[in-house]
Amino acid sequence: MSYRLKLTITISLLIAISFGIGGTLMITTSFNATLKQETQSALSSFESVQNMLYLLNSLGDQSDYESLADALSQMETQGLGRWQALTLKNSEEELFRSGSAELLNYSLPVPAPDQCSYLPVADDQGHGLIVRSLISAGETDLQLQARFDVSHIYEIRAAQQKQYFIVYIAVVFF
């Protein structure tokens, strides 16, 4: 093999490797930024629900949980709730549930009152974000837990990786 051919092949492979590393970093960076943005959006939506429940609880009788459940039901009916599943419980009973209870079968650390904890999950239902908080309601605490669907981000990443792989193969072989 001539020196010129070896040099051409070596430079082509270096370009392909650089292209591969650069593209992978670009997809990963884009995915992480989108996931962070979607997490912030889900947390913001959760905080809106939480603040609405605080407001209703402070305006009415703190033991009247039916008004809280009605408000959540109205939000769901009007399409204002972005959640995939949501529960509101006190220590004795479940006050409101939307969606499948299986979607919320994850143990999260119990947050301090007026704060929330969250956990990204992946299961048969796709990828999601579980968020949990405690709401002070008089002498008892209400537990609000929701799951938000983030599967579409992972689907976009898989499609980008597939397209990139095809382009990468084309660069390597041509």
Which residues does each predicted region cover?
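Juxtamembrane segments flanking the first transmembrane helix
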Residues: 1-90, 155, 162
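Hydrophobic beta-strand residues in large extracellular and virion-surface proteins
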Residues: 86-88, 130, 142-146, 153
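Membrane-proximal, non-catalytic sensory/regulatory domains of signal-transducing membrane proteins
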Residues: 100-144
